[in-house]
């Protein structure tokens, strides 16, 4: 699937080397691949490619919120959190009604431990895109753990578990139950 997708992007770039969206789409797919075990053997190569694609997209059109989000994520991977926050904010300023920019800015705020502020933007992103909100919900248990709100974290973890049980949710829920002092449920 990746090969065919990348070929389509490359064909679009060959026809128009300044087509920002083709670089953004390719960068977005590579970014997702960085966090899957299937592509870990290519992590270094893919990370470099992501940085190059996100920079290219941003240099073509710094007024495209999607390009700015990708560029922001490049700084996140480099652990340059002030730049990450700067560009995430730029993407949000370009289009405050863009769900991806709200989500990205929320997670950038987490790097600064500004969790309550982050919660606002993350929930806002979900409200803006009710059909795609599930793609934003997966990390919510961690946000609430960072906020020391174990009850809210458990609530989100249960929502995710009920949608599709996976052993990782059992582990997360056990850890949350321990935080809550409920050792009986932690053992289940």
What is each of the regions a protein language model found here?
Residues 35-37, 146-153, 180-187:
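Alpha-helical linker/edge segments of TPR/alpha-solenoid repeat scaffolds
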Residues 98-104, 133-139, 164-175:
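Alpha-solenoid helical repeat architecture
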Residues 113, 129, 147-149, 161-164, ...:
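Alpha-helix capping/termination and helix-coil
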Residues 1-128, 140-144, 155-158:
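Acidic, proline/glycine-rich low-complexity intrinsically disordered segments
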Residues 50, 161-165, 178, 183-188:
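TPR/TPR-like (Sel1-like) alpha-helical repeat modules
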